[in-house]
């Protein structure tokens, strides 16, 4: 794209969760129109978009119909469970997919992005193999060795992941992976367990023109394969940061297009090891809602539209901590907000999800402080004060 586009533009958002909601808000602040699409009604982004559509995004015909109905300027995937082969067809027919249809197709499945990174680009990753049945998983686990990590090739927010310590845990890991998979895949990836010091996300911004940009690295902690807290900046050495940026640029250049990419790494004293990549805003990047002059959603929007990004300024140590449901419920309410909001240097975002299940992420607490450790403690304190009530 040679020049910035003329506004307003129309975005078809495929996936309408909390990340899509923040992107929609960013888009609307510049007067754009958003059609929010998801498989269930009243999803978070639908509550702020001009138009909502409920379809199965794994149904290629339904996906094509909604695209042709609205004729969007941009198709912006926000989740994994999309019939990405249809996006390739739509792009070939003249529709613009962010970052590209091919990038979306590759990264929606862990096997494809892993093959690109490890085999084609020569990037250091954990040793890995695949399984499509319990019997295969038992065999592959023995070959990789214990402990190892089992993940569905297609899932979101770490769902279905397990650390397998011995052969007796393989069957449980298979069941968890299949239950946590998105889409219609029954394939898992088995990785060697990396004894890392730190997991980070490096938010990487590709522009249609101009250099690739990076946010300060974001550290994060996971439980049940899902993000629980994140903080910025993560304490990397100059050597580690340079290695991470070089790898992120190599992989995102191979994918092409424009927008923000969440590139995940394991950090050890000796190595920077590529883990995963999402071609869109990243859940751990919600800390940027308080930590940067331009948050990840605004950066994604500017990159898509070819608008200038003169400076990405990290405004001080910051952290996020998730607010989770403890049990299932169809009617939600929240207590403790008055107590939570008394803390200086903090904020709370409740996503507006219509129902709950155990450990579902319903909101996030944000905090800034004099140090990363203090910000992490403060964000956790605020998150714990918000009580999710279900009926």
Swiss-Prot record:
Binding residues annotated for Mg(2+), in chain numbering: 264, 276
Domain ATP-grasp: 115-305
Catalytic reactions of this protein: N(1)-(5-phospho-beta-D-ribosyl)glycinamide + formate + ATP = N(2)-formyl-N(1)-(5-phospho-beta-D-ribosyl)glycinamide + ADP + phosphate + H(+)
GO process terms (BP): 'de novo' IMP biosynthetic process
Listed EC numbers: 6.3.1.21
Keywords for the protein's UniProt record, in alphabetical order: ATP-binding, Ligase, Magnesium, Metal-binding, Nucleotide-binding, Purine biosynthesis
Pfam short name (any one): ATP-grasp
Family statement drawn from the similarity comment of this UniProt entry: Belongs to the PurK/PurT family.
Subunit structure: Homodimer.
Protein name (database record): Formate-dependent phosphoribosylglycinamide formyltransferase
């Amino acid at each position: 794209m040679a020049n910035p586009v003329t506004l307003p533009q129309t975005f078809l958002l495929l996936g309408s969760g909390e990340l899509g909601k923040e992107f929609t808000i960013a888009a609307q602040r510049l007067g754009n129109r958003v059609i929010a699409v998801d498989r269930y009604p009243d999803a978070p982004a639908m509550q702020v978009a001009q138009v909502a559509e409920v379809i199965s995004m794994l149904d290629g015909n339904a996906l094509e119909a909604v695209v042709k109905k609205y004729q969007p300027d941009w198709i912006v995937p926000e989740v994994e469970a999309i019939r990405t082969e249809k996006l390739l067809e739509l792009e070939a027919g003249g529709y613009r997919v962010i970052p590209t249809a091919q990038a979306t197709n590759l990264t929606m499945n862990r096997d494809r992005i892993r093959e690109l990174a490890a085999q084609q680009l020569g990037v250091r990753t954990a040793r890995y193999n695949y399984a499509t049945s319990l019997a295969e998983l038992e065999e592959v686990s023995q070959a990789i060795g214990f402990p190892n990590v089992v993940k569905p090739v297609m899932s979101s927010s770490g769902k279905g992941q397990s650390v397998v310590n011995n052969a007796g845990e393989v069957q449980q890991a298979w069941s968890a992976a299949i239950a946590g998979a998105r889409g219609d895949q029954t394939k898992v990836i088995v990785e060697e367990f990396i004894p890392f010091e730190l997991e980070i996300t490096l938010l990487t911004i590709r522009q249609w023109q101009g250099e690739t940009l990076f946010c300060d690295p974001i550290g994060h902690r996971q439980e049940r394969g899902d993000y629980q807290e994140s903080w910025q900046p993560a304490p990397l050495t100059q050597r580690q940061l340079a290695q991470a940026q070089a790898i992120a640029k190599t992989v995102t250049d191979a994918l092409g297009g424009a927008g923000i990419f969440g590139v995940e790494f394991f950090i050890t004293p000796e190595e920077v090891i590529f883990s995963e990549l999402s071609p869109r805003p990243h859940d751990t990047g919600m800390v940027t809602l308080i930590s940067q002059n331009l948050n990840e959603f605004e950066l994604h929007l500017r990159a898509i539209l070819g608008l200038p990004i003169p400076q990405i300024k990290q405004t001080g140590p910051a952290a996020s901590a998730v607010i989770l449901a403890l049990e299932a419920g169809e009617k939600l309410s929240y207590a403790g907000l008055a107590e939570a909001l008394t803390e200086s240097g903090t904020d709370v975002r409740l996503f507006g999800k219509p129902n709950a299940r155990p450990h579902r992420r319903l909101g996030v607490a944000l905090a800034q402080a004099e140090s990363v450790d203090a910000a992490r403690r403060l964000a956790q304190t605020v998150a714990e004060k918000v009580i999710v009530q279900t009926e």
